[in-house]
């Protein structure tokens, strides 16, 4: 079975379209890892893709309840032994005692006691890679063999340029990157050829349509987000305050 990681972005959409053209929609499944930090238009677009292509797209959303309790226990039992002041411990526990917020991105930041950054992209690992991998393993149990198609392109970064097009990881599980050597123009061309609209955010000065905003977003795009979608900037500011409450230094 072909499993395509769908993000709502142009590259994963082109990958989905390639899989459908080569194998037919009946032999393709999609999986969307909902980080809890997406734009509403992206959620709508993923639903549109499922309806337009006929491919079932499974929505995945991390639950950090167990990790949350472990972190709360660590703060309550270990911080005092490490000399952390009682006021700081009480401030952090006040947040954890409310329980998980139910938003994967925010819960992860609270547990980590910080926001992700370009040098600490734990968001990708925990919110996307882990749930998608777990889902692929579940599919292996059902289908016996799963080929995970990933929409990454070499011209996006030096690290991605070094990735192979195909990897067999054993146990019937493999990874294929069909658009690794494609350009952005090639990607949008695939949309046009299949009669599929791109994510509307691309027409609103956005170059990234995953997390809103992504930690890798440049200043120009942040400026565009603040003008077009100020509510997302306000939301991040609110989340920074919450995360700051569990930080020893009172910042996010």
Indicate residue ranges for each PLM-predicted region:
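Nucleotide-activated chemistry modules centered on ATP-dependent adenylation/adenylyltransferase
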Residues: 1-252
């Amino acid at each position: 079975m072909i499993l395509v990681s769908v993000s709502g972005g142009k590259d994963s959409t082109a990958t989905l379209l390639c899989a459908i053209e080569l194998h037919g929609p009946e032999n393709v499944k999609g999986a969307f890892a909902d980080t809890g930090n997406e734009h509403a238009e992206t959620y709508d677009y993923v639903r549109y893709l499922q309806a337009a292509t006929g491919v079932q797209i499974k929505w995945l959303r991390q639950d950090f309840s167990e990790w949350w309790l472990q972190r709360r226990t660590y703060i309550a039992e270990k911080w005092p032994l490490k000399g952390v002041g009682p006021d700081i411990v009480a401030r952090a526990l006040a947040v954890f005692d409310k329980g998980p917020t139910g938003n994967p991105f925010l819960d992860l930041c609270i547990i980590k006691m910080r926001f992700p950054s370009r040098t600490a992209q734990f968001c990708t690992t925990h919110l996307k890679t882990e749930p998608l991998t777990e889902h692929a393993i579940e599919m292996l149990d059902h289908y016996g063999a799963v080929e995970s198609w990933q929409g990454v392109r070499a011209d996006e970064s030096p690290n991605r340029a070094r990735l192979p097009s195909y990897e067999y990881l054993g146990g019937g599980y493999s990874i294929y990157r069909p658009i690794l050597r494609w350009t952005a123009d090639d990607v949008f061309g695939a949309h046009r050829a299949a009669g599929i609209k791109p994510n509307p955010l691309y027409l609103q000065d956005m170059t990234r349509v995953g997390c809103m905003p992504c930690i890798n977003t440049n200043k120009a795009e942040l400026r565009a987000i603040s003008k077009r979608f100020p509510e997302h900037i306000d939301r991040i500011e609110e989340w920074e305050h919450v995360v700051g409450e569990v930080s020893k230094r009172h910042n996010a």
